[in-house]
A protein has these predicted regions:
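N-terminal targeting signals for export/organelle localization
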Residues: 1-28
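Structural micro-motif
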Residues: 95-107
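Non-catalytic, surface beta->alpha helical segment in thiol-disulfide oxidoreductase systems
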Residues: 106-129
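Local sequence-structure signature of Cys/Sec-based thiol-disulfide redox active-site neighborhoods
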Residues: 35-76
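Structural recognition of the beta-strand scaffold that forms the well-ordered cores
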Residues: 52-55, 78-80, 104-106, 111
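Solvent-exposed loop/turn segments at secondary-structure junctions
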Residues: 57-62, 83-85, 100-101, 111-113
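Structural microenvironment flanking redox-active thiols in thiol-disulfide oxidoreductases
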Residues: 84-93
C-alpha cells in the first residue's frame, strides 16, 4: 500500500516538475497557437492605443491569455514582464503600478485583473473590426 501511495505521488507531481523546469529554463512565455487576422489587428490596435499587459512567464493564466491572441499577434502586444528572473524584467514598474496578480491589463489608466476574451478586450478598448 505504501509503495502505491509513493508511486501515485510521483506520478501526480512529475508533470508539474517537467512543466516548471521547462518554463524556468525559458524564462519567457512560449506562445504556440496561430493568430487570426482579427487577433493581429486587435493586438496592433491595443499597442497603438497604449494598452499594456502585465505578465509573468511562469503564470498559467498569462499563457492562456497569450494563446487567445496566437504567436503572431502576441508579438504585437505591449507586454511588461514582472517576474524578477524573467527576460527583460521590469519588476520595479510592476511594483510602482501596484500589480497584484497576472495577467493584469492597463486600459486607459485602469488596471483590470484576469484573463479577458478578445471580445471583452475589443469592447473595453473601443476596437471595431
Amino acid at each position: 500500500m505504501k509503495r502505491h501511495m509513493i508511486s501515485l505521488l510521483v506520478l501526480l507531481t512529475l508533470p508539474s516538475v517537467v512543466d516548471s523546469s521547462h518554463l524556468n529554463k525559458q524564462r519567457e512565455l512560449i506562445v504556440t497557437s496561430e493568430s487570426t487576422r482579427e487577433s493581429i489587428e486587435l493586438a496592433k490596435y491595443l499597442k497603438d492605443n497604449g494598452v499594456v499587459k502585465y505578465s509573468a512567464y511562469w503564470c498559467p493564466n498569462c499563457l492562456n491569455q497569450s494563446e487567445l491572441f496566437g504567436k503572431q499577434a502576441y508579438r504585437e502586444l505591449n507586454v511588461v514582464e514582472c517576474a524578477r528572473d524573467g527576460i527583460n524584467s521590469q519588476t520595479q514598474l510592476c511594483i510602482d503600478k501596484k500589480i497584484k496578480g497576472f495577467p493584469t491589463w492597463e486600459i486607459n489608466g485602469k488596471l483590470i485583473l484576469g484573463v479577458l476574451s478578445l471580445k471583452e478586450l475589443s469592447k473595453l478598448t473601443g476596437f471595431n473590426n
